[in-house]
């Protein structure tokens, strides 16, 4: 009979620093211990959940003595919800940790030769800063310890909110989210209340059954609101009644869409978004430029910080008005158009066709005539022949997804030999890997992080490069 593993409890652990992925760090007999939701200065008892040769992971079993820096979390869902994990950490300490994260990835781990990293650009708003949130309907919500699951009806087990970390089939029923301004919370709570009252079924991710699947709320600084409601199957009568009820309750919704998504995953990128009522898009403005945002469009989710991010990008590009600029991973062409007035010509490339259509419309609406946009996989479009046909870039701006750039793309960039590059990244680790390749022919001249997501460990980083 196998012997049951005995729990490892570490007492009076002193938390020393903030570590990678938002965890905190302590040292125990030469080994590193990573602890969720801890703050430097905390003294805690920790239950170890993973033990390897050089490190351990665990969670706080008992708070012996809280750090003088520790703050009371402002959200009632803290600790279960997977977002905003740094609520107990003062914002200044969050910024310091993100600055350190960039240094660690580029210098300590990446061994790149970089100048002094500029101070991180903080966010003026640390709550209600997102312009987009997605909520999931589930028949299996997270049941708390003080609840009797057996006594709950099937409807009482329904939830509408966010997936719980490590439990793909569990959803936290969110009462109030501090990430997106109203009417986001009001819309979500109304839809849940209506659905329960009318007996509409929520999605079961294990059995792949149920009516309501997920919902996306997008908002703008101008007060536009877009709602995309996703159903697992069609039921014209029930769907129409729900959409009409939403439209009547929230006249401020300017774009009301629905999707019938019967496939295995809940992504809508390959699904038809059907406009039920209102305008086909919402709009954001930046320095007099108007940007169309459709249901599938990518747009930086922190609008005010996006302006700061793009301003740093433009500053690092050092444009004089005569340059040909390539904007790779252009999205809806925001950066491309943001720098177009300081460039001779801008070429934007993006994988999502709908985003490129929006980019073209945006350029036309803004009276911009020096931007050309192309849709397709970057490694397939950006070839040596493409560069020869469209002209050698003087400046390349890159803003790739978390995975970074494909090796083939890096080769073409090096062959194109632009005078300068600006690399914008949401993942300093993959950025450091790519920079090692690019630094065969380039030197890093400036680095500046930007905080787009307060209360999380995520950080954007902007790097300027100059040809050797």
Model segments located where?
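Carbohydrate-binding surface patches
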Residues: 216-219, 225-235
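Internal alpha/beta scaffold segment
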Residues: 169-205, 209-211, 233-257
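Terminal RNA-binding accessory module
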Residues: 1-77, 372, 380
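Rossmann-like S-adenosyl-L-methionine
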Residues: 2-21, 234-468
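Short, conserved phosphate/pyrophosphate- and ester-handling motifs at nucleotide-, phospho-/glycolipid
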Residues: 41, 180, 302
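Extended interfacial segments that mediate partner engagement and assembly in macromolecular machines
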Residues: 61-72, 79-201
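Short, acidic/hydrophobic/Gly-rich beta-strand patch recurrent on exposed beta strands
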Residues: 24-29, 159-164, 359
């Amino acid at each position: 009979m196998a012997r049951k593993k005995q729990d490892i409890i570490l007492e009076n652990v002193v938390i020393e620093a903030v570590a990678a992925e938002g965890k905190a760090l302590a040292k125990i007999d030469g080994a590193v211990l990573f602890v969720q939701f801890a703050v430097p200065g905390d003294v805690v008892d920790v239950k170890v959940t993973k033990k390897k040769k050089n490190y351990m992971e665990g969670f706080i079993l008992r708070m012996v003595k809280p750090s003088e820096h520790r703050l009371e979390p402002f959200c009632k869902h803290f600790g279960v919800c997977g977002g905003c994990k740094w609520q107990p950490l003062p914002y200044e300490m969050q910024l310091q940790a993100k600055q350190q994260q960039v240094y660690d990835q580029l210098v300590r781990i990446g061994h790149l030769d970089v100048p002094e990293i500029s101070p991180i650009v903080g966010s003026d708003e640390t709550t209600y800063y997102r312009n987009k949130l997605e909520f999931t309907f589930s028949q299996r919500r997270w049941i708390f310890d003080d609840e009797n699951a057996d006594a709950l009806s099937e409807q009482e087990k329904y939830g509408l909110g966010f997936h719980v970390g490590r439990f793909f089939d569990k959803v936290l029923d969110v009462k109030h989210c501090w990430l997106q301004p109203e009417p986001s919370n009001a819309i979500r709570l109304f839809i849940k209340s209506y659905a329960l009252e009318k007996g509409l079924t929520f999605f079961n991710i294990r059995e792949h059954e149920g009516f309501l699947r997920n919902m996306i709320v997008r908002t703008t600084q101008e007060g536009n609101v877009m709602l995309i409601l996703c159903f697992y199957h069609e039921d014209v009568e029930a769907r129409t009644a729900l959409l009409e009820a939403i439209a009547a309750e929230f006249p401020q919704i300017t774009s009301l869409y629905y999707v019938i998504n019967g496939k295995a995953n809940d992504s809508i990128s390959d699904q038809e978004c059907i406009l039920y009522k209102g305008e086909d898009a919402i709009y954001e403005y930046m320095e007099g430029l108007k940007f169309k945002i459709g249901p599938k469009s990518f747009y930086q989710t922190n609008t005010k910080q996006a302006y700061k991010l793009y301003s740093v990008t433009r500053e690092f590009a050092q444009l004089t008005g005569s340059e040909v600029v390539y904007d790779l991973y252009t999205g809806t062409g925001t950066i491309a158009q943001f720098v177009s007035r300081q460039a001779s010509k801008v070429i934007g490339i993006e994988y999502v066709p709908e985003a490129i259509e929006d980019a073209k419309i945006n350029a036309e609406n803004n009276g911009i005539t020096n931007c050309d946009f192309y849709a397709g996989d970057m490694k397939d479009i950006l070839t040596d022949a493409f560069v020869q046909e469209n002209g050698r870039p003087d400046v390349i701006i890159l803003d790739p997804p978390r995975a970074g750039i494909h090796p083939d793309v890096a080769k073409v960039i090096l062959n194109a030999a632009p005078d300068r590059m600006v690399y914008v990244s949401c993942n300093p680790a993959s950025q450091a890997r790519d920079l090692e390749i690019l630094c065969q022919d380039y030197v890093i001249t400036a680095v500046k992080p930007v905080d787009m997501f307060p209360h999380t460990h995520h950080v954007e980083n902007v790097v300027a490069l100059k040809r050797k």
